[in-house]
């Protein structure tokens, strides 16, 4: 997925501190708005609880206070990826081969920006998704947002 320069910088800066606490840094979203939000998704083999989020929030806040990579006021949110897990990297798509994903593209493909289908394959920076019985190929750099589709 095409991360912004700031999101890439934050991912590089915060991966080690999050991993030092025993968690995987799943991804980072920075939402610019009147009140901006820095959202950090973490995970572990044992799942995530509120105390885990608080520990990571404390550690990340300390790093951000020193490095000051964000120049505007923002709220910091730390959470688990949830059932509709966001997808950020080629590795995420590989991990969830065969699962259903919802995509929002930066640039339309076949006059569509929204797609939903089964993840079939990952080849470098390209993914193949089976949509209504037809394989569609998307560049990760063209994916603005991607989430797993939970089934109950």
Curated annotation (Swiss-Prot):
**CDD domains recorded for this chain?**
YlxS_C (cd01734)
Q: From the record, give the transmembrane residue ranges.
A: none
Q: Which GO terms describe its biological process?
A: ribosomal small subunit assembly; translation
List keywords of the entry alphabetically. Cytoplasm, Ribosome biogenesis
A Pfam family of the record is RimP_N
InterPro entries, alphabetically? Ribosome_maturation_RimP (IPR003728), RimP_C (IPR028998), RimP_C_sf (IPR036847), RimP_N (IPR028989), RimP_N_sf (IPR035956)
Gene3D superfamilies associated with the record: Ribosome maturation factor RimP, C-terminal domain (2.30.30.180), RimP-like superfamily, N-terminal (3.30.300.70)
Q: Which SUPFAM superfamilies match?
A: YhbC-like, C-terminal domain, YhbC-like, N-terminal domain
> What GO CC annotations are associated with the protein?
cytosol
Please tell me whether the keyword Cytoplasm is annotated for this protein.
yes
- Asked whether the keyword Cytoplasm is assigned, the reply is yes
Localisation: Cytoplasm
Q: What is its main location?
A: cytoplasm
Q: Which domain of life is it from?
A: Bacteria
Give the family this protein belongs to, as stated in its UniProt record.
Belongs to the RimP family.
Query: Which PANTHER family does its entry note?
Result: RIBOSOME MATURATION FACTOR RIMP (PTHR33867:SF1)
Q: What does this protein do?
A: Required for maturation of 30S ribosomal subunits.
Q: What is this protein called?
A: Ribosome maturation factor RimP
Q: Which organism is it from?
A: Serratia proteamaculans (strain 568)
Q: What is the lineage of its organism?
A: Bacteria, Pseudomonadati, Pseudomonadota, Gammaproteobacteria, Enterobacterales
Q: Which gene encodes it?
A: rimP
